[in-house]
């Protein structure tokens, strides 16, 4: 938005300094290394799932889907799952699980993480997750709202269904409903007796910033004021091409839709821990 405004003003010879701040919890803006609020959204999404997953303690063969915001980028889904598993490990170390009440780490753990940057192999994953269901009587999946969208849209069109789009021409994800689709498909393949889909989107993005985000916000806000007073336009944030320096990134370099790097070490480590094969790279951030 700031880049569009700056371009419009320049076109009409209007001398005005424009300084923007990157505020998207998807964390998908080039060349911003970390956008404001994304850490908080991941932490709050983890808290959200920590509460709703307790439903599976009272249901046999429970399939629980956590749909996380992220149209084109899986960073938030990855980070939310990572935060959630960190909470689980902390609970385990303090002896807070109650096996006799179906409150076990295995039952509450993340069993699959699906992001837009990699393809979902339903057949292979169903075989793997069926074994998880048989062992724990529960399967929990974290999925980005944009994961597998193309395949779902293709199937909708084959059935003759209309695919509504928003003002920008993007498919309306609330109508495509990735979480419901995955829940229905895996529910049948895993023999689930109860399927529940939860969306943490508004809960996570409406939260007050955590301490880590507050520090980043303060640094960026101070730099933004400095840039404005110095007559320097741009979007202020940690520039991933300048060793993370907080600076006014030039407007021509600003672009949304930066994909999550599925070869990121911590992501691959998490998938290994939960028994999910590492995805083949479709695309990575540059």
Region spans (language model):
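Generic secondary-structure boundary/loop-capping signal
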Residues: 26, 33-35, 66, 110-112, ...
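A broad, low-specificity signal for short, low-complexity segments enriched in glycine/proline
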Residues: 26-28, 99-105, 196-198, 224
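Short beta-strand elements at the ligand-binding edges of bilobed clamshell
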Residues: 31-41, 208-214
């Amino acid at each position: 938005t700031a880049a569009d405004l700056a371009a419009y003003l320049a076109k009409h010879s209007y001398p005005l300094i424009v300084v923007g701040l990157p505020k998207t919890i998807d964390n998908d803006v080039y060349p911003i290394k970390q956008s404001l609020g994304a850490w908080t959204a991941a932490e709050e999404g983890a808290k959200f799932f920590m509460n709703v997953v307790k439903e599976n303690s009272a249901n046999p063969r429970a399939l629980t889907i956590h749909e996380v915001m992220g149209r084109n980028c899986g960073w938030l889904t990855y980070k939310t799952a990572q935060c959630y598993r960190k909470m689980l490990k902390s609970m385990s170390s303090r002896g807070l699980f109650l096996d006799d009440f179906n409150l076990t780490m295995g039952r509450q753990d993340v069993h699959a993480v699906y992001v837009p940057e990699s393809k979902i192999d339903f057949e292979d994953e169903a075989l793997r997750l069926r074994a998880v269901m048989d062992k724990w009587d529960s399967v929990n999946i974290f999925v980005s709202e944009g994961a597998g969208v193309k395949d779902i849209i293709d199937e909708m069109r084959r059935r003759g269904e209309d695919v509504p789009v928003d003002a920008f021409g993007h498919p309306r994800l609330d109508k495509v409903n990735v979480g419901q689709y995955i829940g229905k498909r895996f529910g049948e393949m895993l023999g689930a007796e109860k399927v529940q889909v939860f969306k943490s989107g508004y809960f996570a993005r409406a939260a007050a910033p955590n301490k880590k985000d507050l520090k980043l916000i303060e640094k960026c806000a101070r730099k933004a004021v400095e840039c404005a007073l110095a007559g320097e336009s741009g979007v202020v944030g940690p520039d991933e091409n300048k060793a993370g320096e907080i600076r006014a990134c030039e407007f021509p370099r600003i672009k949304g839709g930066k994909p999550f790097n599925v070869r990121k070490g911590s992501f691959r480590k998490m998938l290994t821990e939960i028994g999910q094969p590492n995805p083949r790279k479709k695309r990575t951030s540059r």
